[in-house]
């Protein structure tokens, strides 16, 4: 091997070897245990960023480790290629989304190869190709035939100036991001898939996902939001009954008004002769509110003039249109109990409505609702026959009475809504439905699929080209003229089943069941926690749809889930003339630090003093991204990978420090140097365990302890950083170990082979070279080192000796020494005996293998 470690030469050579030998191409092998490792596939944005590098490095480390465990490992990669950024880039660069996307894929594919990730490139696909989305279209038509797909009108963001629908992220402060026109809410027909039919199963099966972070499961439980409650009817004078859903029927006697959503049919009726109310409803409709903002926004309402009748005590209560009642949850109407619900309390206080308390604390303490509602569960009072009942008893009794009188029923509700899959964008898979002239809607027959998205288009940045081109929509159905659906699928559709397509990417169906059931479920999935509620839930749903269609036998797609932490970097800015922040790349800033490493001054290349904003997530907007390509060019891929895995636990945030990258590079140079020095002296003999001295046994014990620890850290705990730390610690000992005798060299030889094998999943290129230098064959198909139980057995123990609680000496004794033998050696230790001079020994306590404690006075 070369004397100097030169990553560029090594990495190019090793990557060429993997390419030529198709090292990571796999097929099904029933004789081997399979392992399917998958990192969330990237959006081809143009360049890899450090977040990608971290995600894919973790996946590659797991894959290569499992491979050395003798498993048949599949690690595929592909491209989540549809989506809005491509449309925006196309408009900006005066091109079409397709060529921009395919160019980015080529560039990023090369970047992935330079990082040495062991992918089976034979399985690669991009979701924007008809070969992929054709199967999604066909599966959608099958779901339609099963009654799991329907169309209904739903509210979207509409720009009246551009006459186009906007995604939520295209609305800035209530205005269109392009022309600054106030955005309106518009009802348009959209396609939905009935995920709600699977809500209970999606909830229940979370309990089977033992390999998932508890936090993700909690987020999904809350998102699905199962609640048990009562659906009850309030009569409304001169109108239809008003249905409300409540999880707190125990508070029913405290209802003082009913709130309805602006889109509720009753609101529309009430507004017919009330222009003020009509204007208020319009205002509500055009403030589309995310659920997160509901709690903090100002509660507004207006009386409808309608009166509802309390179902049990007959009290008349007013009906209000309220901006915090959502049409798409429950029934679009709520019974308001201001004394026991904070939102209702704020509203009632604002509009001077009655506040009637009916629940008091269980512990008998005084009820105080002067400042806020009392929202705890308690004991009922002023509730007639239900007085004195606690929550569950009151729930059951009130529900039973409502049911007996035909005014209500116990029901289970879910916060989860059906999945709206229509997008009024161009760069997505066309929805395979047509409408004939008689207004009937039909799925496109399988033999006419795929419905191909034209790629050679001109983007004006306003209207989708397939909506603008009236000819594209014209087609026939059973010989009759028909119009195609011009909406495209939500891009979460493609990413909901891609993991399954990798099992049989060339299959002439959505997937090949035999291959899919060999590989699925995915054994290890790696990606960001920001996908907890959307992508991960939709994928679980899609897997159950595939199961119920007979394609897969498993219930869940991903056995284990690791959510990697974000990559942070220093961010710097200066204030411009307009008082805004101009962000400066950390690569253009010179910093001075104090003794504790804190930044005391920062100056950019222009000589400006810049402010340090702290360590924050790498992003384009803060200009604090570090280009992985530059780091690979400077230090090599192995160094970047090692830093990524060592700098922090995989699921925690990682702080990018170039000094840490330099440290990782120095470590690899040290390993290279030791292997080079060792191998240059020729072959070493085998270890003869029986012939080792005490020091040699101790060093060999350290080697095997390290193997045991690293194996556990990687396989079970997934604390890769502590595994690397253990190897570094061992390297320090090996560097200092004597090399005099043949057995010294034999132990070092065994140790270096173990070190190289343990580092291989993390730094595969350098280890490939060092493995060959150590006289070994083909590390890609080698076996993970196993520790020798015998080597871990200690012949001797180091015992601490205390006199009256203070350490006075340390002694070495045989591992099987008796208490008497230890006592004799301990009492005669020079420093110990000095402290026992002229005192009486009262008691001697021996903690085997650890401590001898002497009490004397």
Swiss-Prot record:
Disulfide partners: none
Placement of sequence motif 'KMSKS' region: 617-621
Major localization class: cytoplasm
Compartments where located: Cytoplasm
Catalyzed reaction equations: tRNA(Leu) + L-leucine + ATP = L-leucyl-tRNA(Leu) + AMP + diphosphate
Family label: Belongs to the class-I aminoacyl-tRNA synthetase family.
Protein name, per record: Leucine--tRNA ligase
Organism: Vibrio vulnificus (strain YJ016)
Lineage, top ranks: Bacteria, Pseudomonadati, Pseudomonadota, Gammaproteobacteria, Vibrionales
